[in-house]
Amino acid sequence: MKDKIVTFGEIMLRLSPENNARFTQCNAFEAVYGGGEANTAVSLANFDVDANYVTKLPKHINSLRQYGVGVDHIVRGGDQIGIYFLEKKTSQRPTNVIYNRAGSAFALATADDFNWDEIFDGATWFHFSGITPAISDTLAKVCLTACKKAK
């Protein structure tokens, strides 16, 4: 039997100027969906691990499903996902990142959104990063509840 690993975190939309341009120099952005916990789930799924991703999203599941990540416990709701703008470093300037995650579906998630008993059924490992409980007071409570349920 394969290990079942549950990851929990926010998937975000990264927008970066093309060709190492600065924000003020671009008319188009490269768009990539990702997030630490989602990336972990994708990597685990690539190694044939039963990887399951838990989050709250408006309507953005397909980018995970294509990698074989379990998305059965993604809660639907909210109006937006978190977005961040990444200006890539060059030899003459550092990386510049601007986050816009306030009011995202995940930032507004509450403990009542997730059925942790069902989510953790058969799970052998639970993974989330330190940023997740720091996003909002309610997410700190969600993480604490999840850890207690994970035992």
Language-model features: locations:
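Flexible, glycine- and charge-enriched loops at secondary-structure boundaries
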Residues: 30, 85, 136, 140
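Short beta-strand scaffold segments in enzyme catalytic cores
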Residues: 42, 83-87
